């Protein structure tokens, strides 16, 4: 009988109460072992060297060396633990997204200081994300891209002949940063994105992607028009559906269907794209856990469209792309660094 070693976890938080609660929650989960706690960034780096944890749960706002400083210090080590950020939406959302772009694998939304007793409610989500992180592959964060140069005149754009829809989960902020930073300002198709991320963070994701991208990136609002030069990111907590009226395609936000495991759902976005754009849709499934996107990829293929998947070699978690590929729905696959060439081949 094979004995499976427990996942070794180090809890990092400057709040003694948070350290206590997170330790209790994680220690009570089967297959997890909390090997230590750290009160700040420097303490965390010392404990990482001493205890060799598999996963770090990381607070971001700490005295001295903060969470981003810890991530930067760990970035040079291939043996570094995987990081799950435990952060509050609102003022910390920008920091949390920066941490995901810098290599953190997962994000758990922590209650604000006024509701610390609700930390116990994080249990199931935190345990699941620690387990996901333990199986993730470390990928170097993308090189900081120069800020897109402002153009003195608007880019002349023809009406879109294709639509690109993208679905991703674990590792998604890193992957989207790398992909979008490579797209030229005259990329001919509008893009719609569905990213699994806790509620309250997509506005910050859109802002940070916009800073790295020659295209304009927006958090979806109901009625926003999709057009070439524009990237629309589904708002966390709601589905993004696409509605076409002749040459005009609009974003629609909706909680229905409620039965889906994720809001936004990649399947819901892809299925609406297949209905509205038919054979002119290119669906792209990037790194992520689970199988969200399989039903949507099937709808795109049945409509005559194209489905591309990220290769295992560049995925943080090869779950969603694998599920699509194993279902026989992938038209083609490529690592992230080859995805722009693949898009150019399939986008008109």
Swiss-Prot record:
Organism lineage: Bacteria, Pseudomonadati, Myxococcota, Myxococcia, Myxococcales
Stored SMART domains: REC
Record's function text: Involved in chemotaxis. Part of a chemotaxis signal transduction system that modulates chemotaxis in response to various stimuli. Catalyzes the demethylation of specific methylglutamate residues introduced into the chemoreceptors (methyl-accepting chemotaxis proteins or MCP) by CheR. Also mediates the irreversible deamidation of specific glutamine residues to glutamic acid.
Compartment(s) of residence: Cytoplasm
Protein name (record): Protein-glutamate methylesterase/protein-glutamine glutaminase 5
Keywords: Chemotaxis, Cytoplasm, Hydrolase, Phosphoprotein
Active site: 169, 196, 292
One GO process term, biological-process aspect: chemotaxis
Family that this chain belongs to: Belongs to the CheB family.
Recorded domain comment: Contains a C-terminal catalytic domain, and an N-terminal region which modulates catalytic activity.
EC number(s) given by UniProt: 3.1.1.61, 3.5.1.44
Domain named CheB-type methylesterase: residues: 157-348
GO molecular function, one term: protein-glutamine glutaminase activity
Catalytic reaction annotation: [protein]-L-glutamate 5-O-methyl ester + H2O = L-glutamyl-[protein] + methanol + H(+); L-glutaminyl-[protein] + H2O = L-glutamyl-[protein] + NH4(+)
CC annotations in GO: cytoplasm
Chief place where the protein resides: cytoplasm
Record-annotated Response regulatory domain positions: 8-125
Pfam families: CheB_methylest, Response_reg
Annotated InterPro entries: CheB-like, CheB_C, CheY-like_superfamily, Sig_transdc_resp-reg_Me-estase, Sig_transdc_resp-reg_receiver
4-aspartylphosphate: modified positions: 59
PTM comment, free text: Phosphorylated by CheA. Phosphorylation of the N-terminal regulatory domain activates the methylesterase activity.
């Amino acid at each position: 009988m094979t004995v499976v070693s427990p996942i070794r976890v180090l809890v990092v938080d400057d709040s003694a109460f948070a350290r206590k609660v997170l330790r209790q929650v994680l220690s009570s989960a089967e297959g997890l072992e909390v090997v230590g706690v750290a009160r700040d960034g420097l303490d965390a780096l010392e404990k990482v060297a001493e205890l060799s944890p598999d996963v770090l749960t990381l607070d971001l706002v700490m005295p001295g060396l903060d969470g981003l400083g810890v991530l930067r210090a760990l970035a040079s080590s291939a043996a570094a633990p995987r990081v799950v950020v435990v952060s509050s939406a609102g003022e910390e959302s920008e920091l949390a997204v920066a941490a995901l772009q810098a290599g953190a694998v997962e994000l758990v939304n922590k209650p604000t200081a006024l509701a610390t007793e609700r930390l116990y409610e994080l249990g199931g989500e935190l345990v699941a994300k620690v387990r996901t992180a333990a199986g993730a592959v470390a990928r170097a964060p993308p090189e900081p891209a120069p800020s897109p140069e402002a153009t003195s005149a608007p880019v002349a754009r023809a009406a879109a002949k294709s639509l690109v829809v993208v679905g991703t989960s674990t590792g998604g902020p890193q992957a989207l940063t790398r992909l979008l930073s490579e797209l030229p300002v005259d990329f001919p198709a509008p893009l719609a994105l569905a990213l699994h991320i806790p509620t309250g963070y997509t506005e910050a994701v859109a802002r940070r992607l916009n800073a790295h991208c020659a295209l304009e990136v927006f958090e979806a609002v109901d009625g926003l028009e999709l057009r070439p030069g524009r990237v629309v990111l589904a708002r966390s907590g709601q589905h993004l559906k696409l509605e076409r009226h002749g040459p005009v395609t609009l974003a629609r936000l909706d909680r229905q269907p409620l039965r889906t495991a994720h809001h936004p759902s990649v399947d819901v976005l892809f299925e609406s794209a297949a209905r509205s754009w038919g054979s002119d849709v290119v669906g792209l499934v990037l790194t992520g856990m689970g199988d969200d996107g399989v039903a949507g990829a099937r709808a795109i293929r049945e409509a005559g469209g194209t489905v591309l998947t990220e290769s295992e070699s560049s995925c943080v978690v090869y779950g969603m792309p694998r599920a699509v590929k194993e279902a026989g729905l992938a038209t083609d696959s490529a690592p992230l660094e080859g995805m722009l060439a693949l898009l150019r081949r399939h986008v008109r």
